[in-house]
Swiss-Prot record:
It is linked to Acromelic frontonasal dysostosis: A rare variant form of frontonasal dysplasia, an array of abnormalities affecting the eyes, forehead and nose and linked to midfacial dysraphia. The clinical picture is highly variable. Major findings include true ocular hypertelorism, broadening of the nasal root, median facial cleft affecting the nose and/or upper lip and palate, unilateral or bilateral clefting of the alae nasi, lack of formation of the nasal tip, anterior cranium bifidum occultum, a V-shaped or widow's peak frontal hairline. Neurodevelopmental disorder with movement abnormalities, abnormal gait, and autistic features: An autosomal dominant neurodevelopmental disorder characterized by infantile-onset global developmental delay, severe to profound intellectual disability, mildly delayed walking with broad-based and unsteady gait, and absence of meaningful language. Patients have features of autism, with repetitive behaviors and poor communication, but usually are socially reactive and have a happy demeanor. More variable neurologic features include mild seizures, spasticity, and peripheral neuropathy. The keyword Glycoprotein does not apply. The keyword Zinc-finger applies. The lineage of its organism: Eukaryota, Metazoa, Chordata, Craniata, Vertebrata. This is Zinc finger SWIM domain-containing protein 6.
Length: 1215
């Protein structure tokens, strides 16, 4: 026997924490075919190892494992005992328990100690095995591996029968494993060098590649020495790389692989393909593996000469590698005082586990940490979020297999998350983490909740987790539960009746982190006898129990209830599911749903009895301080998923899981009667109806909108996800009854319902949920559907006058959120959902006048966003004017009414879509008819600005396209034209600056109206109108053939104009030139009247000189529009009015010259000389202009003699 002592680190890998390892905790019935329990999703069959067990009992022929007519001997007692020992006991305990162990017994224990299920190999070599829906691992350790009941030393079974069974089962397992790898690989890329699959190529997954290597015959030299398996795996040559041979070594203990080594240098979380290939070779072909006892046993049988020869040959074969170590050990052994001589015996890496060794599967902690750190450093890019979610899924898979590495792996992940440098950076900058990153933290917290609620967790293990969680929780950068700031809600994760801490001072509460709920859950236990009865039996009832109090343990039918804070109770369900107890989770879920339904009925009764007193005193009570939808523990989603899974898993599959009470002790039956499980459901009900009903209960719950952007987005997201799942279910008559029942409750349950008559001002709106209810109920009960949808339309948080506190603030809610000002970060999304609900109702109500009127009234009352009402108006218009049917005039009127409301809402506010809205309204009114167009023009002042009314509304109404579209007769045209002219004049009176021109245009065909509009312009010209507007109207008048009116307006415009000396590019210059040209064309008198205005308003020399030259080129009145003629002589510059203009022009040049010289730079000298040249031309137009210009130049030379270079240029040019 191997001698054990204090072993040096290289001999043993002590890396596992204590925990409920799952590899050996299941059925003892199977040891059968290699992979006989391995399904296409890497899951065990109905009973792991069942095929092999049946074969061992003579049923092999029926199962196809043996040829017809062949039978197999029963499994030997030696193999049965050896298999159980190999699963449960470390080999050291066997050695210590028995003084001598016969060699055949040792061989069978060593034989059965290797894992026999491929499921674990698959789990540790790929991200996702597809086994998430499978149950616990209790059936894995005995199934899927090993060869029936024999094969290999010491067996008394028939070799031929054993070989046949193993070969057939191996073939089946190979096909199943290939299918499982394909299912697992699709869309689930691995990480690291071993299996990065960006495109979802399953052939690159380590497990799939390992199968391929095995099937290709690439595994050789397989040798099992004790609890150590070794072999070589040949990697075939590919185009870029030559063939390589990898040396693989595997240590195992109690049906778990405890360490792996491969020369391929793989750096990954999971086992490489070579380890997979060698492991599957041992599982599928155990009779082809050379089996030896631990090396210490072999050495024990050698005498001194043999031992010396053995050591010398070993050193000779590997002298370059082991000689230094051999010499060092020899020196230590020969030294009497060396440490090695103080220890009895010597280590043996092939001798199996010691008593103190932890029994868990090999997990490379360093690689887990490195990979998580890498994913976090990528900051959400390159699919890192998806990879981390896959790691979380792997943790859940391990938990379901009851593998202690689940908690161990999550600890490693959490440590890396806590070490993320971005946490402190975000905290310092006061910025929120990204939404995807925040969701990863949520999943982290939820997984810890599952782990600490493990129903079979040891107290010392839970204490260790609690210590670690508190350590993380105390770190400053630990993320808060709500994503933004600490929750103001009290500690609700407890097993006590809720509301006990409702009045706790929120200011004194510490912030709740993502670990707070897991820390609180450490105080929960599973020892409650009522709870154990619920989860351990389908037959737990009490018909003698008639206590109808709120917290009674049974309802009136004798069915068990579970009164606990709902999210906490649902966390128990999630924990049971996560740890592989689906039957127990289902039992508790049913009890919780029945409790919720009973509470719901009592709430309805209570509200009905108190309804009359409600307006007078505050008597309502909200029993849920936290909403269940969007809750960190996702209670509704957990119940829904558990019940929906039960719809897909039949009783036979559920019965395959180990008995939950195996480690908890049997419960006493006492006086309880027994009832079949299906009696816990009403007649006609099923798990599906329960799932749907609990989803409706959760979605319809009245709940306060939480604080913070993230939590509010989470509420919306979770609601939409749950509704999306509901939409996948096809409604039948049974489900419709559930919908009706819940819809009635929602309408009548008052403050307990989010659709009750009275709700809190800050309650989460029901728009999304109501839209789903509406569409679901509409074909079956339209009246109820509309009641639900219309009730849900309200959005009280936007109401300017909130209802009184007595009606809307039940005392529990008021104590938690006292008068805080709501910050609804998701308000835009909520309003969009409100709009979607309204649009759905409008579409459904097409053709129903009464319902359309009701929906319209609701929209006008409850929707406060003009853009959303405009969208609804457009939607209604599109529905009403579909191409394949006649227009729906009622829906068109609804569309028009909504459009009118939009106009009123946006009339006094800025809206960038306003012009689009006005144009659309006119189009809509046109579709409705001529009376609608006339109506909007009659009431234009409540709908439009004067500018919109004249430039868009009236203009469009008067257009030819409108007349043609409506097929108007002369009388109708005149009526519309009269309304348009009236509108135009009213707008011109109210806003002449912007509407005068439009008014004149609209009134052209009516002389009286046109004169009225012109008079309005004249009256406004002296007060509010600008020269630009007056010039525009003046040009219009000239164009229409009214030159004198144009002249009048031009003179009025000139009085408002002021052009300084340097504004030689002013946009009004063309208007001034046009006005002067108009005056010149009308005659000398008109020109004489306008020139003083020009001189007064224009100081720019170039503009004045331009006007002067134009006036001297032609005779005034020669091109007069009225045909009158003046004398053919040109006007003299020495006489008025041109003399005044000439003097003003010369003066402007003088002033401009001095202004320019004040700030002139050398680069502008040449430009200045050209300017003086133009000035000289103007000077010379006067009879003494030469003298004036000479004096002007001399004066410049004297004043600016300091500018020598400039003056030199002046002298050169002008003397």
């Amino acid at each position: 026997m191997a001698e054990r002592g204090q072993q040096p680190p290289p001999a043993k890998r002590l890396c596992c924490r204590p925990g409920g390892g799952g590899g050996g905790g299941g059925s003892s019935g199977g040891g059968g075919g290699a992979g006989g329990g391995y399904s296409s999703a890497c899951r065990p069959g109905p009973r792991a190892g069942g095929a092999a067990a049946a074969a061992a009992c003579g049923g092999g022929a029926a199962l196809g494992l043996l040829p017809p007519g062949k039978t197999q001997s029963p499994e030997s007692l030696l193999d049965i005992a050896a298999r159980r020992v190999a699963e449960k006991w470390p080999f050291q305990r066997v050695e210590e328990r028995f003084e001598r162990i016969p060699e055949p017994v040792q061989r069978r224990i060593v034989y059965w100690s290797f894992p026999r299920s491929e499921r674990e190999i698959c789990m540790y070599s790929s991200f996702n095995t597809g086994g998430g829906a499978a149950g616990g691992p209790g059936d894995d350790s005995g199934g899927g591996g090993g060869a029936g009941g024999g094969g290999g030393g010491g067996s008394s079974s028939s070799p031929a029968a054993t070989s046949a069974a193993a070969t057939s089962a191996a073939a089946a397992a190979a096909a199943a494993a290939a299918a499982a790898a394909a299912a697992a690989g699709a869309g689930a890329p691995s990480v690291g060098a071993a299996g990065a699959a960006d495109g979802g190529d399953e052939t690159r997954l380590p497990f799939r590649r390992g199968i391929a290597l095995l099937e290709s015959g690439c595994v050789d030299n397989v040798l099992q020495v004790g609890f150590h398996l070794s072999g070589t795996v040949t990697e075939p040559a590919i185009q870029s790389e030559p063939e390589t041979v990898c040396n693989v070594a595997i240590s195992f203990d109690r049906c778990k692989i405890t360490s792996v080594t491969c020369s391929c240098g793989n750096k990954d979380i999971f086992y490489c393909a070579h380890v997979v290939a060698l492991s599957l070779y041992r599982i599928r072909k155990p009779d082809q593996v050379k089996l030896h006892l631990p090396i210490s046993e072999t050495l024990f049988q050698m005498n001194r000469d043999q031992l010396q020869k053995f050591v010398q040959y070993l050193i000779t074969v590997h002298h370059t590698e082991v000689l230094p170590t051999a010499q060092k050990l020899a020196d230590e052994i020969l030294s009497q005082n060396s440490e090695i001589n103080q220890v009895h015996g010597a280590p043996d890496p092939t001798a199996g586990a010691s008593i103190d060794d932890e029994n868990c599967w090999h997990l490379d902690e360093e690689q887990v940490q490195e990979q998580v750190k890498l994913f976090l450093s990528q900051g959400g890019y390159h699919g890192s979020g998806k990879q981390l979610n896959l790691l979380f899924a792997k943790v859940r898979e391990m938990l379901k297999m009851r593998d202690s590495n689940g908690a161990r792996m999550l600890t490693l992940i959490t440590e890396q998350f806590m070490a993320d440098p971005r946490l402190s950076l975000w905290r310092q900058q006061g910025t929120a983490m990204t939404d995807k990153y925040r969701q990863l933290w949520d999943e982290l917290g939820a997984l810890w909740m599952c782990i600490v609620l493990n129903p079979h967790c040891k107290l010392e293990q839970k204490a260790s987790w609690l210590k670690q969680l508190k350590k993380w929780n105390s770190v400053d950068v630990c993320p808060w539960e709500d994503g933004n700031h600490g929750s103001e809600l009290p500690n609700l994760t407890n097993a006590l009746p809720q509301g006990a801490n409702a009045n706790q001072d929120s200011s004194n509460r510490p912030h709740r982190t993502v670990f707070t709920r897991a820390i609180e859950a450490c105080d929960l236990h599973w020892q409650d006898s009522h709870l154990q009865h619920i989860i351990s039996s389908d037959l737990y009832t009490n018909y003698c129990y008639h206590d109808d109090t709120e917290n009674s343990l049974f309802d009136s039918r004798g069915w068990p209830l579970w009164h606990e804070h709902v999210p906490t109770a649902c966390a128990r369900v999630d924990a049971l599911r996560s740890h592989g107890y689906p039957r127990e989770a289902l039992r508790l879920a049913i009890a919780i749903v029945n409790t919720l339904r009973r509470q719901q009925q009592k709430q309805l009764e209570m509200f009905r009895t108190q309804k009359k007193e409600l307006p007078h005193k505050n008597i309502t009570s909200i029993t849920n301080l936290e909403g269940w939808v969007g809750h960190p523990l996702d209670p509704v989603g957990t119940l829904f998923s558990s019940l929906m899974e039960a719809c897909r898993i039949d009783d036979e599959n559920l019965s395959g899981f180990s008995d939950f009470t195996e480690n908890m002790g049997q419960c006493k039956s006492l006086e309880y009667q027994h009832l079949p499980a299906h009696k816990f459901l009403e007649e006609g009900e099923s798990y599906l109806t329960l799932a749907v009903e609990v989803a409706l209960i959760g979605l319809g719950q009245q709940r306060i909108m939480p604080d913070g952007l993230y939590t509010q987005e989470k509420v919306c997201r979770n609601e939409e996800q749950l509704i999306s799942k509901l939409q996948e279910i096809e409604l039948d008559d049974t489900l419709v009854k559930i919908f009706r029942k819940q819809a009635v409750f929602l309408l009548e349950a008052g403050p307990y319902s989010g659709l009750g008559e009275i709700i809190h001002r800050e309650s989460v709106p029901m728009h999304t949920f109501a839209k789903y209810l509406f569409t679901s109920l509409l074909p079956h009960d339209a009246e109820l559907a509309y009641k639900i949808a219309l009730r849900a339309m309200r959005l009280l948080v936007l109401e300017s006058t909130a209802p009184s506190g007595d009606l809307t603030r039940p005392h529990h809610i008021a104590s938690v959120v006292p008068n805080r000002y709501p910050r609804w970060f998701t308000l835009s999304h909520i309003e969009s959902q409100q709009c979607e609900l309204a649009s759905t109702m409008l579409t459904a109500a097409k053709g129903d006048v009464r319902r359309l009127e009701t929906v319209l009234e609701s929209i006008q009352k409850n929707i406060h966003s003009s853009s959303h009402i405009f969208k609804l108006a457009q939607d209604a218009f599109k529905i009403a004017t579909l191409m394949d049917s006649l227009p729906d005039i009622t829906l068109l009127k609804v569309s028009l009414e909504l459009g009118l409301q939009v106009m009123r809402m946006t009339l006094s506010t800025l809206n960038w879509r306003r012009r689009e809205m006005v144009r659309w309204l006119v189009t809509c009114a046109t579709e409705v008819g001529v009376y609608a167009l006339d109506s909007i023009m009659q009431t234009w002042f409540t709908l439009f600005t004067p500018t919109e009314a004249t430039s868009i509304v009236a203009t469009t109404v008067m257009s030819n396209s409108t007349i043609v579209r409506l097929h108007l007769d002369c009388h109708q045209q005149e009526k519309l034209a009269s309304s348009a002219r009236t509108l135009a004049l009213q707008c011109a009176m109210k806003d002449p600056q912007n509407c005068a021109l439009s008014a004149l245009t609209l009134c052209e065909k009516d002389h009286i109206a046109f004169e009225t509009a012109y008079q309005i312009v004249l009256d406004a010209a002296t007060t509010g109108m600008s020269y630009t507007q007056l010039f525009t109207i003046a040009r219009y008048m000239e164009h229409r053939g009214y030159p004198m009116r144009a002249y009048k307006l031009a003179t009025l415009a000139m009085t408002h104009l002021n052009l300084s000396y340097n504004q030689d590019t002013h946009p009004a210059i063309n208007d001034v030139l046009w006005a002067c040209a108009l005056s010149h064309s009308l005659g000398k008198n008109e020109l004489a009247a306008i020139i003083p205005l020009v001189v007064k308003s224009v100081k720019c020399a170039t503009v004045l000189s331009d006007i002067l030259r134009r006036c001297t080129l032609t005779t005034p009145g020669m091109v007069g529009l009225h045909g009158r003629r003046n004398s053919g002589k040109l006007m003299s510059l020495d006489k008025a009015p041109l003399r005044q203009l000439l003097d003003a022009t010369i003066g402007a040049y003088i002033n401009t010259t001095h202004s320019r010289l004040t700030h002139i730079s050398p680069r502008h000298y040449s430009e200045f000389i050209e300017f003086l040249s133009k000035a000289r031309e103007t000077f010379l137009m006067a009879h003494d202009g030469h003298i004036q210009f000479t004096q002007f130049i001399d004066n410049l030379k004297q004043i600016y003699k300091g500018k020598k270079k400039l003056m030199m240029l002046v002298r050169e040019r002008f003397g």
